Amino acid sequence: MIRILLSNDDGISAPGIQTLASALRGFAQVQIVAPDRNRSGASNALTLDSALRITTLSNGDIAVQQGTPTDCVYLGVNALMRPRPDIVVSGINAGPNLGDDVIYSGTVAAAMEGRHLGYPALAVSLNGHQHYDTAAAVTCRLLRALQRKPLRTGKILNINVPDLPLAEIKGIRVTRCGSRHPAEQVFCQQDPRGQDLYWIGPPGEKYDAGPDTDFAAVEQGYVSITPLQVDLTAYMAQEVVESWLANTEVDGEW
């Protein structure tokens, strides 16, 4: 039986992770290690300045107190799930993680930590808040396929599912990340003592939503699968930077 470490960024009681756990337990051994509260937008944050405490629930699920998604996967792999998992799954997120969203997403970060620690990893998001059962069914189907034939890319699979009944899903597309215009809006308020409060505004509008992007696939009713990698090196820019250094003589005599 496949062993799955399951985490998220919406918190341990979120409907997405609970729906997915129920579906996965039909054919897998599942250990939930998730934040005790919503940590959306936590990205790859790792808690280094304080100790982490856990609460083990009556069903065996583990909540990490004030933990980030990355904390949860790190603890799950290195301390809390024994034997260790075969795969790390993050989700189901309430709302999509498309395009530039992946740099902020705690859902994607949890999967990235799993991959960084040497495990296959999936991040699963629903383009809405209704049909979690659809996203769970898609995830189960992919995991069963991975059991039959492992995918040895060494990459994270970022999966975005349209918020539709399963029968209305048109299929699966392998995509690239689209992009958004930068978000510039900040909401300023004052508390009762006159101190300024700032709220981060909504994400920017779509900028690159071409036919091969994750945006386009989900909008057209397809499940989007975008391979992501931990290595952020821009290999094609290395020669450009080398040439620039030579031409500007920055790397000259010190």
Swiss-Prot record:
UniProt cross-references to PANTHER family, sorted A to Z: 5'-NUCLEOTIDASE SURE (PTHR30457), 5'_3'-NUCLEOTIDASE SURE (PTHR30457:SF12)
Cofactor: a divalent metal cation
Pfam family, one: SurE
Protein name as it appears in the record: 5'/3'-nucleotidase SurE
NCBIfam families assigned to the protein according to its UniProt record, in alphabetical order: PRK00346.1-1, PRK00346.1-3, PRK00346.1-4, surE
Reaction(s) catalysed by this chain's protein: a ribonucleoside 5'-phosphate + H2O = a ribonucleoside + phosphate; a ribonucleoside 3'-phosphate + H2O = a ribonucleoside + phosphate; [phosphate](n) + H2O = [phosphate](n-1) + phosphate + H(+)
Keyword Nucleotide-binding: yes
Main subcellular location of this protein, as a coarse class: cytoplasm
Source organism of this protein record: Yersinia pestis
Classification lineage: Bacteria, Pseudomonadati, Pseudomonadota, Gammaproteobacteria, Enterobacterales
Keyword Lipoprotein attached: no
A Gene Ontology cellular-component term: cytoplasm
GO molecular function ontology, one term from the record: nucleotide binding
Gene coding for it: surE
Known role: Nucleotidase with a broad substrate specificity as it can dephosphorylate various ribo- and deoxyribonucleoside 5'-monophosphates and ribonucleoside 3'-monophosphates with highest affinity to 3'-AMP. Also hydrolyzes polyphosphate (exopolyphosphatase activity) with the preference for short-chain-length substrates (P20-25). Might be involved in the regulation of dNTP and NTP pools, and in the turnover of 3'-mononucleotides produced by numerous intracellular RNases (T1, T2, and F) during the degradation of various RNAs.
Subcellular location: Cytoplasm
EC number per UniProt: 3.1.3.5, 3.1.3.6, 3.6.1.11
Annotated keywords: Cytoplasm, Hydrolase, Metal-binding, Nucleotide-binding
Family: Belongs to the SurE nucleotidase family.
